[in-house]
Amino acid sequence: MPEPALTPERRHVEPGGLPPPAPAPFVELGLVTCFSFLRGASDAVDLATTARALGYDALGVADANTMAGVVRLHSEALALGLRPVIGCRIETVEGLGFLAYPQDRAAYGRLCRLISAGRMARLDGEWQDKGACDISLAMLAEHVEGVHLVLLPPDDLDAVLTIAVESNVVPFVARGDAETRRRKEGVRAEGAEETEIAEMACSRRSRVPSSTSGEDEMPAALAACLRSPDPLRSLREPENPHISATLTAPFADLLPHLAAQLPTLKHLAASYLYTGDDLARIARLDELARGQGMAILATNLPLYHAPQRRPLHDVMTAIRHKTTVARAGHLLQPNAERHLKGPEEMARLFAPWPHALQAARDLADRCRFSLEELRYEYPEETCPDGLEPQDYLEQLTWAGAARRYPGGVPDSVADTLRRELDLIGKLHLPRYFLTIKDIVDFARAQDPPILCQGRGSAANSAVCYCLEITAVDPAKHALLFDRFISEDRNEPPDIDVDFEHERREEVIQYIYARYGRHRAGLCATVIHYRPRMAIREVGKAMGLSEDVTAALAKTVWGGHGRSIKEAHVEREAGMDLSDPHLRRVLALTEQMIGMPRHLSQHVGGFILTQGLLTETVPIGNGAMPDRSFIEWDKDDIDALGILKVDVLALGMLTCIRKCLDLLQAHHGQDLTLATVPREDPVVYDMLCKGDSLGVFQVESRAQMNMLPRLRPRCFYDLVIEVAIVRPGPIQGDMVHPYLKRRRGEERVEIPAPGPQHGPPDELTSILARTLGVPIFQEQAMKIALDAAKFTGLEANRLRKSIATFRSRGMVAELE
């Protein structure tokens, strides 16, 4: 029976808690993760944990035409003391595959740019489809500097391959064919070479795949060339660089051409196929490699971390090819040998070719690039010439403070602004704030203005308030700046800005136009298999009927979780759990849950860079017109410390905008979000009756039920109302004590520390406004900072552990 997936929640290894292992004699470089969607059957946790147990000290990653999985493997490998070797597998439109490993930061940038080119445009220059990637050998040759290539040979070394090549290789191949014939015939005819070249060029007609028309059976440019008076001269002239031809030849005959066109191609991948002739096949590969000045490189090309994952891989293969496991036939792997094998096992298999093992070790040692080398800078366009970003930010902040506080900036606010600006400068964040300011200013400068509002932890920042990114005065509401940014923790701030949902596209296209598509991209969102999707697709691949898979899907309660409850299957679907096939389907489904299905675009998280974003991470096209997004999601971005700009859509802002327009049109009242009266008694009378249908934040059944019980009479009461109807306060038994104290049914008692531990009002200053009941995350952080003397980093960890229901044991660590 397949074993359950090893998830991050089940890994009991402290990051950095293990010493680095001794160098192994071999490094696996052909590994794919589950981010080679429906091709890799193990995630980064499984792979890194298994690699550590097998004795590896380094581990390569080579997902197909993508860098989507490198950050996760990077993080998990480092946590286990392993060195991640960052790379990918390039699959060309000609049908050839290469392992590609950059040796430094510049080479990594070229590799990302290559993948971006394949994902953003077709070979004809048209807009690329989402998820597709067209990379030609010519494109690869333009980006190989510093990128070590390992050619993946076909299983059958005698197979005849057809590839599209630039016209200038036709004479090269013709000369090769001519020399072969001459060696056989022992003759050398003067002038024969040019004749043979012309014959080779003209013979292309029969080698091009058939089509419906006659002359168009060959590429149009080549056909025009052959109709010219001197086709040989046309083929050789440099003014025809884009003429291409189709070349058909055995793999061995293509190898010289590939070696000549790809100067960093120095290795052929050698692996066991377990078809009975592996020794002879690898020996022949070794001979071919030596003939071109190359070497073979050992790899098992693992598709999963352990043999037990082979059934899941079969299911993934069936899903990918839209068939069933029973009908997949030769599409499936013939055995379970494509798992991650240890260095000792690989040394046994490649005992006749120790240089193949050494080649893998040497290549891994040469490729020292790490994702930690990525240095991220925000665009410079937001800063006028002659001004430093920090100086310009301070100038805008103090000008905004004068507008926010027309009667004079209070001393406490001025002190807060100085402290925040100093920290922003120390953390090198001025451009980030200037970029947000630029986007918000664009929205408000439109005619009519696009309604927008900053929210989230950015409301804790006085700088954001003075820049008019947010509309909440943190001094008035005693908000904690450490919730937003802290010097103690190494993570970027997060500023979320909501825009009218009907006009957000204007903002997005402005960002693309201002910074360019190669410097701006939306974050990705990883679409994972949830229980219902998993049971439907696994069941279909395993041959279950649609009725059965639908019945099984209905037994899943909720959209999350990592298991299918057998009791629900038996009781609600009426199925016999003693059926071994059904139990196997359920076990495979549990393995599939949580696996990535594909990438989608984030709702609005933008990454902007000063240099080419395509040299930091590959960019691909979205399903929506004129949308492109990077291959990393918000967790990947956070892990690397890269900042993002959240350009979000909020339907209620559109509703409010139309409301304000109607007030202006019919009643002559010119109101904005900032000038709408906050303390209107008639409005609070309606809210106390629960009359809030369609009112943002208080329209749910739970909120409508709470309103008559809490009876808000001011704006801050509404803040408490929205916050208290949350899982945390409800499960923490904070709702009833607060309501009783609000109604006078319970005394308000706030504990005070002893004289030796702090001032008597230490907690009163934090909890007085909520009647001694902690409701907000900021209150928990403030208590930890003042009473428990936590550092900012520890207080933020406490906040995250309280807010995240999956963080079992994190609170106990901080006790």
Language model features by range: what are they?
Residues 1-165, 172, 250-815:
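Alpha-helical scaffold/interaction cores of sigma-54-like transcription cofactors
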Residues 166-168, 175-213, 220-238, 242-249:
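Short, low-complexity, charge-dense intrinsically disordered segments
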